[in-house]
Amino acid sequence: MWLVNHGGEREIIMKYLGAAVSDTGISKRTNQDGVCIKIADTEQHGQIAMCVLCDGMGGLKKGELASATVIRAFIEWFEQQLPWKISGGIWDGLSADWERLVKACNFRILEYGKQEGITLGTTVSAILLMEGHYLIAHVGDSRVYKIAGTVEQLTEDHSFVAREIKRGNMTEEEAENHPQRNVLIQCVGASGIVTPDILHGRTEKGDVYMLCSDGFRHKLSTEEIYEEFRAENIGSAEIMEDKERYLISRVKTRNERDNITVALMKCEE
């Protein structure tokens, strides 16, 4: 089904499948990751879907509080603000909305940390899917991938090693075992100033978007991810969840020590 927007451009009315699994892992006592999926039906725009994934800082106190704070803020935005915002221009202002939302979360968590005398923080990777488009907001080293024929990383890690690789000072092989491989150069709640990456793009029927914490991806190859998560292999939310649990179990057998979280969103017409 198609809809023509005010600018005369054809927009696709899509439906979405989504599923997410989060696991404490084999060594940690608490799960500091957080994830949510929200899908809403609208009369004018078809389904609108949002997925948000956060990884609370494992080395910081109360990381689960930081991740939960950001997840809750995005859910409130989706349920309370998005409905009246889309009654006008579809994408007008949504990017600025998400940037303000992330910065507000950063301020709130920073202030809480000051009051309690602790440091806490979280990554955030969020995607909004609507009418053949996606919007992504990203801070940290959780990731968003697009799976459509290949596995394409859409986000850039805000980490020390990623920055050094980009500058040509380090190889990817060196980064894998570098003592500062887990150091982030910005995260929500532990950085004085946070500047989220905001990304836009078009979606097609059959596109799959994967959000994951670093604990999920460290022990898996892109070939393994593609084989399980390509569109033809995930025909329902139940199958999605089964395959997510299968890969998480594989990661755990490979001695991953972190919390492990993965979410999938599939575009359908």
Where are the regions a protein language model picked out?
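PP2C/PPM-type serine/threonine phosphatase catalytic domain
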Residues: W2-E269
